[in-house]
Amino acid sequence: MPRRREVPKREILPDPKFGNVELSKFMNVIMEGGKKAVAERIIYGALELIQKKHPDKDPLEAFTVAINNVKPMVEVKSRRVGGANYQVPVEVRPVRRLALSMRWLKEAARKRGEKSMAQRLANELLEATEGRGGAMKRRDEVHRMAEANKAFSHFRF
């Protein structure tokens, strides 16, 4: 954290196809080694696959629902008190909430067994809209940890 001044947030431009800022943030999360064109192809491919599988569903809406379902409300942070480390549950800030949900969706999609990354991502997003999948499992795990350590919530930061 800077001591002198607050670093200004960079403005992220909306993606070219849908004009959605969240989608372009997700594109940046998916991107590796500065290869934005590859990330773009993966994401748009996944959204097209969602459209093909469920013609009645809007793929952008499915993406938004998936992101919102995966967002964690609470997480645990380590806090040292009197020679012991406690896992203290804390509420997650909105910006971190979004970042974590995107990161978890990416990681869960990577671990899947489908052929292409677009297929993996499409299936992970569809499962997340239904409250299933690897990313949802991760969120539930984090929530369970926070629930288990509720007794230490008075050690707030």
From Swiss-Prot:
Biological process, per Gene Ontology: translation
Quaternary structure annotation from Swiss-Prot or TrEMBL: Part of the 30S ribosomal subunit. Contacts proteins S9 and S11.
Molecular function per GO: rRNA binding; structural constituent of ribosome; tRNA binding
HAMAP family named in the record: Ribosomal_uS7_B
Matching PROSITE patterns: RIBOSOMAL_S7
UniProt entry keywords in alphabetical sequence: Ribonucleoprotein, Ribosomal protein, RNA-binding, rRNA-binding, tRNA-binding
Family: Belongs to the universal ribosomal protein uS7 family.
Alphabetized Pfam families for the sequence: Ribosomal_S7
One GO CC term, this protein: small ribosomal subunit
UniProt protein name: Small ribosomal subunit protein uS7
InterPro entries: Ribosomal_uS7, Ribosomal_uS7_bac/org-type, Ribosomal_uS7_CS, Ribosomal_uS7_dom, Ribosomal_uS7_dom_sf
Domain of life of the native organism: Bacteria
Record's keyword annotation contains RNA-binding: yes
Function: One of the primary rRNA binding proteins, it binds directly to 16S rRNA where it nucleates assembly of the head domain of the 30S subunit. Is located at the subunit interface close to the decoding center, probably blocks exit of the E-site tRNA.
